[in-house]
Amino acid sequence: MTDLLSLYRTMVRIRAFEDAAEIASQGGVAAWGKQASDKPALVRGPLHLSTGQEAVAAGVCAHLKPADLLTSTHRGHGHTLAKGADATKMMCELFGRATGYNGGKGGSMHIADFSVGMLGANGVVAAGLPIAVGAAQGLKIRGQDAIAVCFFGDGAINRGPFMEALNWAVVYHLPVLFVCEDNRISATTASAPMTAGPGASARAASMGIAAVQVDGTDVQAVSQAAGELIREIRTGSGPRLLHALTDRHKGHVSVDPGTYRDPKDVQAALARDGIARTRAQLVAQGHTAQVEQIEREAQT
């Protein structure tokens, strides 16, 4: 099991980045109508925050090596940070600066850092799936000791690339982990009414892919499940799928007030916050000083 303090450090680092990015993009109004700043917006364009979903990125990426490859989604800041990307270069990219990862021309949804195996976020739903499968096939052809990981949302399972990617991965027995971050909301609409039949786990199982469903707000549960699946992939067992049930705390984009959501559902999601849960565990274990140090470091 990966050290809980290390997992907490990654989660807090992601949350601090998302909080700063949110304020920079708001023009004074934070999600849910709360005042964030009286300064004008410094980040333009859509900004999809992963606030609330940190445990999935932290738990999975804790088991990845530098040579492992990763593809992400439009909500990809957490994955990118957890894979080892530089937070300053990421923020510069959001600000449109030449010192950003893409020279300030890609923005939030297209950040990539090949030096740490981050092949890129993607503004098209489900588009990262075939990219990850192609990367995995490349690793296998070259005989490299590495795997590919693909993060995608629950809305992606209703798009063609999802089934195509799973099929290809099974046919060619590829070293790829599919990670479904299921926050049960596709943009501004509940996913369930738009989904016929079973979800990601059952669809993967129908193709012979072993799948595990886990509480995506519990970073220890995510880490344990992801670690086992990744070990199986590394030993030649073929593709695997992790279905993480998680919560999106914010609107679809940073300026979205989320009024289409039931306030009770939002409060329930906030009450399940993985960071708060992990903090409480660590404090109970006597790690208050380390927790506070991690939190101070995340703000710098």
Give the location of each predicted region.
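Residue-level recognition of short, well-ordered coil/turn positions
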Residues: A16-D19, G28-V29, D68, L174, ...
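Cofactor-binding active-site loop characterized by glycine-rich and histidine/acidic residues
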Residues: A30-Y172, P193-A196, S201-G208
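Glycine-rich ThDP/TPP pyrophosphate-binding loop and its adjacent helix/strand module
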Residues: M118-T300
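Short, cationic motifs built from Arg/Lys/His that form the positively charged side of catalytic pockets
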Residues: R15-E18, R75, E228, R248
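Short acidic, gly/pro-rich beta-turn/loop elements at beta-sheet edges
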Residues: A21, T80-A82, T188, H252
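Intrinsically disordered or highly flexible coil/loop and linker segments, enriched in small
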Residues: F17-A21, G100, G104, T235-P239, ...
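Conserved acidic/glycine
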Residues: M1-V56, S254, G258-T300
